[in-house]
């Protein structure tokens, strides 16, 4: 029994040592790659802000109003509710 425990510990130590090998500092992306030459700072033309996530996603379990109120309280408002268009409306 002690032999099996010793072998198991030795195997675990060997696995830890094998996984702790240093990672090479060589960049695997070649210089002529398409993404390397693209401009890194491209302007975003239009943002898409989805305000219906809390009301739409949780409406199946009837938690939509609770989640909306919690979301509004976390933002610093007094509470909130989901209107008929499934948009969270926060109260002042």
Swiss-Prot record:
Expression across tissues is:
Hemolymph (at protein level).
Q: Fetch the InterPro entries from UniProt.
A: Defensin_invertebrate/fungal, Scorpion_toxin-like_sf
Induction conditions: By bacterial infection (at protein level).
UniProt KW DNA damage keyword: no
Principal cellular location given in the protein's record:
secreted
The UniProt entry's GO CC annotations, sorted and at most eight, read: extracellular space
Signal peptide extent:
1-20
A Gene Ontology BP annotation from the UniProt entry: defense response to Gram-positive bacterium
Q: List locations, semicolon-separated.
A: Secreted
Question: Known Pfam families for this protein?
Answer: Defensin_2 (PF01097)
Q: Which residues form the propeptide?
A: 21-52
What does this protein do, in the record's words? Responsible for the anti Gram-positive activity of immune hemolymph. Expressed in the absence of immune challenge during metamorphosis.
Q: Which family does it belong to?
A: Belongs to the invertebrate defensin family. Type 1 subfamily.
PANTHER family per record: DEFENSIN (PTHR13645:SF0)
Q: What is the name attached to this protein's record?
A: Defensin
- Organism equals Drosophila melanogaster
List the gene name: Def
């Amino acid at each position: 029994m002690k032999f099996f425990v010793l072998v198991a510990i030795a195997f675990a130590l060997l696995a830890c040592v094998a996984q702790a090998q240093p990672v090479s500092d060589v960049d695997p992306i070649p210089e002529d790659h398409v993404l390397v030459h693209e401009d890194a700072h491209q302007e975003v033309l239009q943002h898409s802000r989805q305000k219906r996530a809390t009301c739409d996603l949780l409406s199946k379990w009837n938690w939509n109003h609770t989640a909306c109120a919690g979301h509004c309280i976390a933002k610093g408002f007094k509470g909130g509710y989901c209107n008929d268009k499934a948009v969270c409306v926060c109260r002042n």
